[in-house]
Amino acid sequence: MWLQAICIYTVFIIIGCGIPTAAEEHSLWRWTCENNRCTKIRNEPENKEPVLSLEACKMFCDDYGLLWPKPTIETNLGNFLSKINMNTIDIQITKQGKSDDLLTAAADRFKTLVSSSVPKGFSAKAAGKSVTVYLVNENPYIREFSLDMDESYELYISSTSSDKVNATIRGNSFFGVRNGLETLSQLIVYDDIRNNLLIVRDVTIKDRPVYPYRGILLDTARNFYSIDSIKRTIDAMAAVKLNTFHWHITDSQSFPLVLQKRPNLSKLGAYSPTKVYTKQDIREVVEYGLERGVRVLPEFDAPAHVGEGWQDTGLTVCFKAEPWTKFCVEPPCGQLNPTKEELYDYLEDIYVEMAEAFESTDMFHMGGDEVSERCWNSSEEIQNFMIQNRWNLDKSSFLKLWNYFQKNAQDRAYKAFGKRLPLILWTSTLTDYTHVEKFLDKDEYIIQVWTTGADPQIQGLLQKGYRLIMSNYDALYFDCGFGAWVGSGNNWCSPYIGGQKVYGNSPAVMALSYRDQILGGEVALWSEQSDPATLDGRLWPRAAAFAERMWAEPSTAWQDAEHRMLHVRERLVRMGIQAESLEPEWCYQNQGLCYG
């Protein structure tokens, strides 16, 4: 009879034993795993099979359950789901060191993530097994970012008694242990039939990322973003194990960075006195990112992309030049004048204060794209300087002028940061592989590729020995596919880039035999047409698709990940991220039936 004590199980899943609850008896729907898909079926009164909620079913109906990004070394998810009491989760740090405060913050965040798995307006039953999480950080004194930091971890979950579940996370740094906590949070799901939290038992996961650099660029100059919106972005990044927030903080349209030594830059260049970033603001974001395993990488773009804020310095040329289409790619135009010796004192002051604000940065982005020869050539002062140096006013001579600027700026950056930290530049005519070695040392510079993934420059630079970060606009520019903001029609990089293309954008395919020189990739949100109100939907969940590509470099296509992608979108929304909807919820509940 149905009311007998039974064990709820299938071939692969055992939830527990006991009398079926009223919720189980009266649930109209249940899910069952068939051919690696969770199928929605009616829960008839005579049914004696397990009454599985959708998330419980999805946790076992795939080799990777609901994990995102999927682990890279070993993933064994056991056949048990145990009810747990969220109020009895205990986290213990087993080794002491200077990263303990970071682990404590990560542990608090883990509990918040577990709480967010319960839908708003509901409260999971305070019943079930207690959970003890042991955090084993083998190098508790490491708390600094680097390109060779160890982000690997091992995660084990077992049940030691009828009322207790143990989880152990081991890592060779705080960053690895933090990643393990993120994975553990994904192994806890809400059972909306029984109103319980469930954890997967008998788990072994060994995991590490394929690429060390996995980033998001946010442009906060075209439109201003609040500190809260930046923190929200970092929260979402941490949830999918992205590790670099690239802050494009100034541009020709605005200068929101407050500097004590050069206060007029923000006074003249910010959109308003309330739309600025102080040193305290930046340090707050840097610390917030560190606790979540996300470095905050500063960019100061030069010698182009300057304008507002620089009006009284006498250090720019062609600012607001008209028609703008002759001198730059978008209004207002503006470039620094490399011939002004006082410019480099100015830059050093900027770099010094950026070094103080972004105090934990292990790299510095110097911008360096879209420099206009015509802009420089419009200045009689620059022309005279070039003639005095016996340079012609041709393309090759303007490259010499650009190199003159870059060498001086590089020296000032090294001085300001107090070390010869890696420098990053965008692809440009200066980085063209046919002459890049004349200007940029491959051991000092990393090149960030923003042209297409088929650009011959990629192979050319790799063959010269340069390390690359991939941001090819045909797959990773998230501002593409909207209406033009200058003129009519669509914007320059249309069409819209869907998550499917993002997921399939493989640096390994682009690198061929030079894969070791690919540091990773970065999606970019240039903000001509976005602001805090549209931020979440522009980035998410597409950036999650990118995150799995960067973490795992999967050999499979997006179709194999689609059901997990739909779930990670749901997780982000529960966290308070207004992620864009990908499909009708019907598709989430009816896996495999929404195909084209």
Swiss-Prot record:
EC numbers: 3.2.1.52
GO MF entries: beta-N-acetylglucosaminidase activity; beta-N-acetylhexosaminidase activity
Cellular component terms per the entry's GO annotation: plasma membrane
Gene3D superfamilies xrefs: Chitobiase/beta-hexosaminidase domain 2-like, Glycosidases
Reaction equation(s) it catalyzes: Hydrolysis of terminal non-reducing N-acetyl-D-hexosamine residues in N-acetyl-beta-D-hexosaminides
Span of the signal peptide: 1-23
CDD domains: GH20_HexA_HexB-like
Family (UniProt): Belongs to the glycosyl hydrolase 20 family.
Annotated protein name in UniProt: Chitooligosaccharidolytic beta-N-acetylglucosaminidase
Source organism: Bombyx mori
